[in-house]
Amino acid sequence: MKVTLFGATGQIGQLLVTQALQAGYKVTAYSRRSNALNIEHEKLQIIVGDLTDRGKLREAIVERDVIVSTLGPVLSMKRQVLDLPIAEAHKAIISIMEEYGPKRFLTLATPTISAKEDVKQLVTQLPSIMAKLLYPTGYAEMKEIENLIKNSKLDWTVVRIINPNVKTNGNGYSVSLGDTKGKMNVSRYNVAKCMLEATQKDEWIHKMPIVFNN
């Protein structure tokens, strides 16, 4: 399988690159900075470019099987929302995918993005409330990404996480689609593992699993 990863230099992104290569995937890692990813492998291609450079984005996207984003917003507590660079990146990626393919798109978010399956519980409601109060720009990024995803023509999956700071991987991970009880904490390793496995899960198309440690 040929996969392109945006956000490859982040902590979750680097884990996902490593896991994908170990699984035999051909990986294209998109980075905004050269020499930012200290991984070498015969099946790894690194493309350096801006997140709004349509030429570079097209080079990274076309003729792949699945596109994955682990891009995340800056957690600023400033009340004024000036711009939404991560949402703008999603807009560009989605636009190119709709024009040239592929159709399969996975992105990382929080339960600030709501799923139609969501029922009232802590994991589906608290993240949105806290983000709106504490991180206005992050909240605005998530809501705009939600709008872009839900109105796209892609076969998308949104993997939702809360507090990916758990140091142990526990006994693996579980997911809730929002309609069953979920938990608040997850390790970055398990987030990456879930996203990798989601590339093979057609049953998660147009779903928003919340992943958490067992």
Stretches with model-predicted labels:
Residues 3-23:
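N-terminal Rossmann NAD(P)H-binding glycine-rich loop of SDR-like oxidoreductase domains
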Residues 119, 168-173, 198-207:
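Glycine/proline-rich active-site loop of Rossmann-fold NAD(P)-dependent oxidoreductases
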Residues 4, 35-92, 96-99, 199-203:
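NAD(P)H-binding glycine-rich loop region in Rossmannoid oxidoreductase-like domains
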Residues 156, 201-214:
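Core catalytic loop region at the nicotinamide-binding pocket of NAD(P)H-dependent oxidoreductases
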Residues 144-167:
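Conserved beta-loop-beta element that borders a ligand/cofactor-binding pocket
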Residues 26, 34, 88, 92-137, ...:
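Conserved Rossmann-fold NAD(P)-dependent oxidoreductase catalytic core, especially the SDR/UDP-sugar
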Residues 86, 141, 159, 186-196, ...:
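Substrate-positioning beta->alpha
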Residues 76, 111-117, 164-167:
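Conserved catalytic-site region of short-chain dehydrogenase/reductase
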